[in-house]
């Protein structure tokens, strides 16, 4: 006795569910069984049972019906509203026309880290950011920024340890990294607006924003004497705006007087008037220092306004708030108090949080980036110093091109 089994194409139609619309059932399988003559009726009976089980889907139960879509509730009449705010939001054209706050590449200052070497070094705690070689990498990055309308940059130096000292003399070396870089950029890009940092900590062996006395106290007046010389050196190199970022008393007035005395009346001062002691700073720094004796307590708002008022009286041209997103209330209060332009610094920690969450697919990085910048503008900032400057400006340029092509 011999038998063989082989598969043949199925001729049984597919089974569909309720009204044959949304549900597609299982497709039947079919087999042909060729049975030779058997001497045993019992074997033939078993094969018939096997054959009946191989085509079970044909007799399978239908799938349960798909639930119907809930009907819209019926109302007797619409609400009698004198105003429906949604009318002004019903189409893209109207939403764009009524938008109260706008942002453009002209609002951005692009912070750039530079060092003496030629190779661009990644900053591990800030995805996408680099310590740029001051001659090649920097020039290329500035050119990219200018291509998308970012015409302002701020320079931050990585000073070699061998050049640091307790009193920071390298800060006002006319042949130092910052003056050389400013001259190079002005030669290549004459219309570029260059902001420089009048800041002591990068040049100090202690890392503090001032000369540290024997008792551990920051020496206010002695440090300002050094900052004045630093500001003049930067102005001499061609800086357009010097930024007094150390929260030391009287620094703005002293720097203004020094600049004027040297004939740099047209060089502006952007004062970091409100610089909070924030945990969002300097994730690219190796050492975190306690700077609470000269930076502002994040719990205080009146103190922040007082500092800004004093800087304005001393001759500041722009008032800066740092960090940006945690200080939106301060930006608004300051906007209501002064007629001076206001800057906001979206610091490294703010940048890294958005970048990290974007890389982990927890948020839409681009949308959160643009929303954060728009909120800073809405609060009252005229300028935003942001590591997103190039990325955001590139997106804005793309949107403008799409709009003009339509």
UniProtKB/Swiss-Prot annotation:
E.C. no: 4.2.1.24
Boundaries of the annotated transit peptide in chain numbering: 1-34
Cell compartments where the protein resides: Plastid, Chloroplast
Keyword field: Allosteric enzyme, Chlorophyll biosynthesis, Chloroplast, Heme biosynthesis, Lyase, Magnesium, Metal-binding, Plastid, Porphyrin biosynthesis, Transit peptide
A biological-process GO annotation: protoporphyrinogen IX biosynthetic process
Superkingdom of the source species: Eukaryota
Primary location group: plastid
Positions of 5-aminolevulinate 2 binding: 348, 387
Cofactor binding note: Binds 2 magnesium ions per monomer. The first magnesium ion is required for catalysis. The second functions as an allosteric activator.
Stated role: Catalyzes an early step in the biosynthesis of tetrapyrroles. Binds two molecules of 5-aminolevulinate per subunit, each at a distinct site, and catalyzes their condensation to form porphobilinogen.
Quaternary structure and interacting proteins, as annotated: Homooctamer.
Protein name as catalogued: Probable delta-aminolevulinic acid dehydratase 2, chloroplastic
Organism from which the protein derives: Arabidopsis thaliana
């Amino acid at each position: 006795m011999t038998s063989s089994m082989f598969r043949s194409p199925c001729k049984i139609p597919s089974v569909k569910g309720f009204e044959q619309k949304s549900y597609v059932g299982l497709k039947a399988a079919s087999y042909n069984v060729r049975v030779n003559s058997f001497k045993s009726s019992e074997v033939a009976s078993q094969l018939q049972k096997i054959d009946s089980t191989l085509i079970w889907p044909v007799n399978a139960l239908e799938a349960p019906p798909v639930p119907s879509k809930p009907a819209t509730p019926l109302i007797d009449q619409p609400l009698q509203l004198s105003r429906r705010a949604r009318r002004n939001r019903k189409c893209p054209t109207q939403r764009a026309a009524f938008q109260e706050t706008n942002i453009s590449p002209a609002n951005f200052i692009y912070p750039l880290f530079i060092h003496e070497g030629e190779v661009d070094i990644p900053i591990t705690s800030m995805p996408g950011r680099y310590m740029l070689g001051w001659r090649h990498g920097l020039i290329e990055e500035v050119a990219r920024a200018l291509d998308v309308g970012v015409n302002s940059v701020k320079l931050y130096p990585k000073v070699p340890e061998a050049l640091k000292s307790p009193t920071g003399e390298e800060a006002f070396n006319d042949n130092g990294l910052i003056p050389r870089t400013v001259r190079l950029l002005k030669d290549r890009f004459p219309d570029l607006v260059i902001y420089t940092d009048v800041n002591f900590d990068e040049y100090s062996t202690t890392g503090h924003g001032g000369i540290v006395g024997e008792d551990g106290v920051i020496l206010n007046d002695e440090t300002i004497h050094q900052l004045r010389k630093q500001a003049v050196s930067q102005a001499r190199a061609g800086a357009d705006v010097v930024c007094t970022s150390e929260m030391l008393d009287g620094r703005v007035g002293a720097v203004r007087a020094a600049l004027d005395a040297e004939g740099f009346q047209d060089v502006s001062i952007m004062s970091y008037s409100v610089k909070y002691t924030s945990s969002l700073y300097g994730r690219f720094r190796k050492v975190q220092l306690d700077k609470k004796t000269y930076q502002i307590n994040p719990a205080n708002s009146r103190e922040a306004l007082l500092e800004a008022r004093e800087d304005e009286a001393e001759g500041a041209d722009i008032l800066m708030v740092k960090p940006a997103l945690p200080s939106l209330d301060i930006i608004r209060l300051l906007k209501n108090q002064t007629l001076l332009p206001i800057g906001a610094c979206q610091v490294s920690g703010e940048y890294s949080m958005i970048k990290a969450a974007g890389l982990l697919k927890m948020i839409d990085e681009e949308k959160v980036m643009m929303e954060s910048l728009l909120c800073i503008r809405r609060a009252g900032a005229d300028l935003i110093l942001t590591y997103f400057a190039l990325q955001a400006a590139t997106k804005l340029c793309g949107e403008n091109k799409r709009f003009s092509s339509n």
